[in-house]
């Protein structure tokens, strides 16, 4: 292949990535997410006061954030942190493995909870009062590759569940019946 053919091929490849990057940038700007880190994007979407479902798709796996406008899918790696979103409930829940930031709706929106996450050695990772978002979920960023327990309490009722933050772990925990 000649030098000019290589340059043309390189230019086409570069312009393809530039087009993909500009489409992703336009999507982020359209939804008020431009200039944010992946953590900030996740927090912004999960905590939005808009009713579900949102006008775009956003879901989080153990390794990446997936955004879509229905035509293209944009994926952003999470890096060294893990996002766990959970929805305590009193009466009803839904099955969930990967949290849909744009679609999941829990039973108890805008409620105060006491949240505690401990690792398998008993070290406290998170311990604080948190309010569920409009979608009824609460999200926490945790260290990757840990096992532990999530405990939640509300009005004298408690729920707990084993958790893990590995590459194959769930990011949506809805099995938290308050008793």
PLM segments and residue spans:
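Bacterial N-terminal signal peptides that target proteins for export
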Residues: 1-7
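N-terminal signal peptide c-region/cleavage motif recognized by signal peptidases
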Residues: 15-20
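Terminal, intrinsically disordered low-complexity segments enriched in charged/polar
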Residues: 21-84, 94-100
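Extracellular beta-sheet/turn segments enriched in Thr/Pro/Gly and aliphatic residues
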Residues: 76, 82-89, 167-179
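Mature extracytoplasmic domains of secretory-pathway proteins
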Residues: 80-124
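Short, acidic Ser/Thr/Gly-rich low-complexity loop/linker segments typical of extracellular
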Residues: 122-135
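Glycine-centered loop-to-beta-strand initiation motif
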Residues: 132-140, 150
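A short, solvent-exposed beta-strand micro-motif common in secreted/extracellular proteins
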Residues: 146-154
């Amino acid at each position: 292949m000649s030098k000019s053919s290589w340059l043309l091929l390189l230019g086409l490849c570069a312009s393809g990535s530039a087009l993909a990057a500009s489409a992703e940038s336009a999507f982020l700007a359209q939804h008020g997410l431009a200039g944010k880190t992946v953590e900030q994007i996740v927090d912004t979407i999960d905590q939005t006061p808009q009713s579900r479902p949102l006008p775009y798709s956003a879901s989080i796996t153990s390794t990446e954030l997936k955004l879509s406008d229905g035509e293209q899918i944009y994926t952003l790696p999470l890096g060294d942190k893990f996002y766990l979103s959970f929805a305590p409930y009193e009466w009803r829940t839904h099955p969930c493995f990967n949290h849909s930031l744009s679609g999941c709706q829990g039973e108890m929106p805008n409620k105060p909870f006491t949240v505690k996450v401990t690792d398998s050695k008993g070290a406290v990772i998170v311990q604080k009062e948190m309010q569920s978002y409009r979608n009824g979920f609460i999200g926490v960023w945790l260290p990757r590759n840990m096992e532990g327990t999530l405990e939640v309490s509300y009005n004298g009722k408690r729920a707990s569940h084993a958790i893990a933050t590995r590459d194959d772990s769930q990011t949506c925990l809805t099995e938290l019946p308050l008793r």
